[in-house]
Amino acid sequence: MGHALCVCSRGTVIIDNKRYLFVQKLGEGGFSYVDLVEGLHDGHFYALKRILCHEQQDQEEAQREADMHRLFQHPNILRLMAYSLKERGAKHEAWLLLPFFKRGTLWNEIERLKDQGNFLTEDQILPLLLGICRGLEAIHAKGYAHRDLKPTNILLGDEGQPVLMDLGSMNQACIQVEGSRQALALQDWAAQRCTISYRAPELFSVQSHCVIDERTDVWSLGCVLYAMMFGEGPYDMVFQKGDSVALAVQNDLSIPQSPRHSSALRQLLASMMTVDPQQRPHIPVLLSQLEALQPPAPGQHTTQI
């Protein structure tokens, strides 16, 4: 693990013997901050995520997030460039050096279009959805689930390709729940780590004897697809009005009619938003359906889907 050193007078930091210049703050939330930095060795921009670690458990969770990144070398999953632990007296900061995406997140794009009175077209949605699915497929193939998929956790590359980020909530894909104590512990964990308006129904009220699997991500993916289609998540307004999301997700989702969307896309969304997780499709099934729906490349014959 690299060592970090702050040279505040020059606004630079050193990670793994490379110097980075602080440019500006990008954002903050909870106990973490994200800064834009420039690598003085290569002139490239990076996002430096700094996690405040008040306890040993915080350090372990930050290390685990770094370990999750290192599991993957995939175009649709955010790459970790470097990881360092910085000591400041009795406190520590975990630093994750990540690629910088100037286009921001999928949510930024949805909001930008909405401000213009527009939405993503189906021909734009389908390749995005395919890329997100491929990222999830890679995560699930290694026996993990993302558990906090949402538009703000999906970056957009220069060519518009989706890249999954924020792997701090990832855990094992298949969880065998055996008893009320374990069920309550998992439910409490989900309340803290899984965004409420994108959280699968089975995580709101975990049964004493059940199996929670990676299809929680498929539900969240359905919420992301809904947001791409309609400009907001299906339960965003429920949460904003102070109504019960836990109650709302127990009912079948009503999908608005729109001439912008094919029946095939609507059926795909409906399958993802199946309340019973055992009836929800796995990612490989969705991938095969999605690949058949992809818009043709420029110059190819187009058919209505």
Curated annotation (Swiss-Prot):
Membrane topology term: Lipid-anchor
InterPro entries in the cross-refs: Kinase-like_dom_sf, Prot_kinase_dom, Ser/Thr-specific_kinases, Ser/Thr_kinase_AS
Binding site residues for ATP: 26-34, 49
Entry annotated with the keyword Plastid: no
Processing and modification events after translation: Mainly autophosphorylated on serine/threonine residues. Also autophosphorylated on Tyr-198.
Induction: By TGF-beta.
Lipid-carrying residues in chain (S-palmitoyl cysteine): 6, 8
Listed name of the protein: Serine/threonine-protein kinase 16
Organism: Rattus norvegicus
